[in-house]
Amino acid sequence: MEEEASRSAAATNPGSRLTRWPPPDKREGSAVDPGKRRSLAATPSSSLPCTLIALGLRHEKEANELMEDLFETFQDEMGFSNMEDDGPEEEERVAEPQANFNTPQALRFEELLANLLNEQHQIAKELFEQLKMKKPSAKQQKEVEKVKPQCKEVHQTLILDPAQRKRLQQQMQQHVQLLTQIHLLATCNPNLNPEASSTRICLKELGTFAQSSIALHHQYNPKFQTLFQPCNLMGAMQLIEDFSTHVSIDCSPHKTVKKTANEFPCLPKQVAWILATSKVFMYPELLPVCSLKAKNPQDKILFTKAEDNKYLLTCKTARQLTVRIKNLNMNRAPDNIIKFYKKTKQLPVLGKCCEEIQPHQWKPPIEREEHRLPFWLKASLPSIQEELRHMADGAREVGNMTGTTEINSDQGLEKDNSELGSETRYPLLLPKGVVLKLKPVADRFPKKAWRQKRSSVLKPLLIQPSPSLQPSFNPGKTPAQSTHSEAPPSKMVLRIPHPIQPATVLQTVPGVPPLGVSGGESFESPAALPAMPPEARTSFPLSESQTLLSSAPVPKVMMPSPASSMFRKPYVRRRPSKRRGARAFRCIKPAPVIHPASVIFTVPATTVKIVSLGGGCNMIQPVNAAVAQSPQTIPIATLLVNPTSFPCPLNQPLVASSVSPLIVSGNSVNLPIPSTPEDKAHMNVDIACAVADGENAFQGLEPKLEPQELSPLSATVFPKVEHSPGPPPVDKQCQEGLSENSAYRWTVVKTEEGRQALEPLPQGIQESLNNSSPGDLEEVVKMEPEDATEEISGFL
């Protein structure tokens, strides 16, 4: 040890004798020039390699331990990940000083130091690799422990219960039908070729998935059935091939024809026939009703009902969903699922669009229930069935004539043939005798279907004249128009609304000649006796058959239109009228023909007015009432129109005359008649209305006719009342017979004050009308112009 210390000390001293140890001249294999030996020996760097070599040879254990300590310290401070990157750098750092060593060429101990450093580097590298392996293994163990329970849960979610499997089977069958329908419809439109090809690819992919699934599970379970292959998939693929091969549809552009905006795009006839007769389309509810059109993309976002029922919509933005929900929650929006959920916070039970069909139940739509078919198939069903019947009869006849029916002994082959026959029972191409109605028939009266039904209270009461009281006189010539006018009066309906107070409008009624009727002095007939002011009076227009023409000038007749009634004639189309009131129809008929008219109140020669009593009741009151002198019982038949029943006793002072007048009323009352026929006293008719609940307005009404001879010009006809729960309207074809000698001539004139008044005709006019013969009445009646202000005139 002392020698080594002395040698190390001498190495540090340049003047020491040991600096040249071993002497250069004693080195083996030294070929160095003696002149250069001094310079090499004098260099101070020659002592460092010697020291390192000595340390490396004798203290290898200490060096290894030192390197391990350094490595551990460095690992704790910097981490092993950084050490991996620094490894190559250390190697370079070690190599660089090794190349810069200025050692004598005679020294060969330099290789020992290099080997030592390489060994230490390899040891450190192995330690790094061990540490790397330890950490990932620990992480993997933790991850495996976490993943184990998750794998079990995922395995559970992949199992379908029987209900889910059944539902998935139905959805796959519907999916195949929809893909096939879209392919057929898109093939007919050249602009939809991408859609046609994509649907065909989807069907082929389903077949590919089914084959791979069967190949995977068949070795473990030979009875395995995949849901990728529904019962109609093979038929759909075969139908697509046959359609592209045998069916040709003209897709060339036709001549441009002016089309309306709402023109219905009908199905192609050939496609409609395939849709109706193929078993692939096993759900009739999913059949299309129109063809497909290629439309350019629109900026407006549309939502379908199926999208409203979804929980997640990836194809819509949050803004679009917000606007959609807001629009569906508006008050004017129809009832929908979103509004229902907002109100009740519950999801409604959604109905099934299609009924479940099992594979052994599938058949073409034409064999399904009729209520499940679309409109075009319902309309075309009779034609299809008739053509199929003819085809079956023809095939049966051919089979009987040729005798080619063969019996197959193999049951399996018979079954295959029967199935094949059932599939090919309908031809692929449309037969010539089949007429398909593919366009919907528009409703002729679409508004009437939505019109509110009339309540039973407002139903009209039909009134017919009594057959025993028909006119006994018929002139020699009866025109052809009389047959139409003598139609059953049950079709002549008069609508009576609720009692209102119309404004009294004086106007000439079109189609009504001047008033001159034998057998009575005045005619006033409120159809429903509406409530009116005392000064207002309603005059009822007479029918043309009751109107006789006068030879003398007749004052202008002003007739108010009944505001509470409206006449309708059968088979006559009425044009809408802006003004309220009745509308008479123009018709030219001879005067002697007697037609039933509306209800007529025969009043003796006087001026009367209608006084409203309230509650829909009215009273006929003379302007100047006279005191009756002697009572006389006269049978009266009155027909008053009111929704409720009420007795109407009439008290009337009449002017006595040689011929007793005829008054129409609902019951027999005592009417006082004056004894002096010359004095024309005024009539007073008081109507006391006592409303009786729950009774018909015309119960117990029996018309009574005064026993007197019927006039050839005017026959007595009383109405026959039919009971109904609604308000009884007045029939237009009611007649009132007036005796020839007991009638007065009255006309309605307009006074200066703007009111109506009944004035008697001159005595000469009355006598001329009384003395007129039936033959003189067969002349043509001059019609009143439609202008309400034009004067009505007639000539006998």
Curated annotation (Swiss-Prot):
Residues 23-36 have a biased composition (Basic and acidic residues). Residues 473-485, 765-774 have a biased composition (Polar residues). The keyword Metal-binding does not apply. Keywords: Cytoplasm, Nucleus, Phosphoprotein, Transcription, Transcription regulation. Its main location: cytoplasm. InterPro entries: YY1-Transcr_Regul (IPR052435). Interacts with YY1. Interacts with MAD2L2. Interacts with INO80. Associates with the INO80 chromatin remodeling complex, which is responsible for transcriptional regulation, DNA repair, and replication. Enhances transcription activation by YY1. Plays a role in cell cycle regulation. This is YY1-associated protein 1.
